[in-house]
Amino acid sequence: MLLFQHPLAGIQLVKGTVETFDESYITAAKRELAEESGITHVISARYLCSWDSGFQNQAWHFVLCECADLEDSWTFHTKDDGGHDFAFFWHDIGSDISSQAHTVFQHALEKVRKLIDQGGV
């Protein structure tokens, strides 16, 4: 699973807001992926599910994006919050992130694990 180290806020998943101009959750996910990671070529994208995060009344929508030829790790300078360097890496879905991430990201990772266990991914 693609994660990144935010310089101020620990380990996170690519996420963001569905804007009024987004045609779908898939469109929003692809836009956020490009804005936060620099990944602009998505081979395919599939909506997985919605999830009540329990954090600030946020509903999250999981989208699986298939991309080709990505590095094992890279840094991308995003314009989010005035500009940050996000350090991206591939994370073993079974490994814990509890000491390095906000609980909402820990719970999101658990949700993805359940989707995999149920054959949804």
Describe each region flagged by the PLM:
Residues Q100:
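Surface-exposed, interaction-prone regions with an acidic/low-complexity signature
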Residues M1-V14:
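N-terminal strand-loop-strand
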Residues H6-A9, D80-H84:
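Short, solvent-exposed aromatic-acidic interface loops
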Residues I43, H84-F86:
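A short helix-to-beta-strand connector/capping loop
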Residues D52-H77, F86-S95, F105-G120:
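Active-site-adjacent beta-strand/loop module that shapes the phosphate/pyrophosphate-binding cleft
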Residues L13-L48:
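The catalytic Nudix box helix
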Residues K15-E19, I26-A28, T75-T78, T103-V104, ...:
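Surface-exposed beta-strand edges and their flanking turn/coil or helix-capping segments
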Residues A9-G10, V18-E19, D96:
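Short, catalytically relevant binding-site loops at active-site mouths
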